[in-house]
Amino acid sequence: MANASICTIGDEILIGQIVDTNSSQISRALEDIGVKVTRMVSFGDDHDEIINTLTKELTSNEIVITTGGLGPTKDDITKAALAEISGSESYVVNDGQLKMVHEILHARGLDVLDINKAQALVPDTCEVIVNHMGTAPIMVFRFPVERFGHEATLYAMPGVPFEAIGAIPDVIKDIKAHESLTDIFHKCVMVFGLAESALSKEIESWEDSLPEDMHLAYLPNPLTGVRLRLSIYGGSREEEERRIDEEFARLKPILGR
């Protein structure tokens, strides 16, 4: 099973000027293919912080996906940080993205400036997925096992929501082509008439006896009660569903329901 970290980069996120809608969309797409998201992290446009945080996330996860910091202005420094992390010694022009820069700006009736052309410059250590929705490419950095103790891949996506969301299918396709993936299965039951703390006490022995590969989450709602979610990562979907159904069947007599 592959673990993933989703990182949003940009001062505008930290000061509340922009709401991060990308992470939830990316997380759902990863969940659908059996990738477990372990962390979501937001940090600002600071060179050292980008390097330190991404190094930490790459050490702990097989997949790291970043959004933001790839624009053409001086405050967009993610590309330079990624070049340093990956040991890049030079930048190269990606012809596919350069063509897209011209097409997008011409369609908007805008001149193509040098600052726009620079969007197609990428570190020589990355692969490129052409961004058909904007001018900044999706950069893919693949790290060997010697670097972080395991093979790791970093996908750097633009932060503009419609561009990031538009790039998700291509990123997911690449992950499926390079990772050994397993199914993830979740199932929920609703419990009424008990607060979360009281419910936790009531089912403590049942929770303690759950198999190690099964995870329980409490999802309280003041209007509808407490939703209990059981999750299994790995195995076949049919087997996972059967096992979860058995555990919920054991729960019913405990609750007297």
What role is predicted for each listed range?
Residues 9-11, 66-74, 158, 233-235:
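Glycine-rich beta-strand-to-loop/alpha-helix junction loops that act as flexible
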Residues 152-254:
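An accessory alpha-helical subdomain
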Residues 49-52, 59, 76-179:
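Proline/glycine-rich low-complexity loops and linkers
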Residues 3-5, 62-63, 127, 138, ...:
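Structural motif
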Residues 55-66:
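Short, structured active-site "lid" loops
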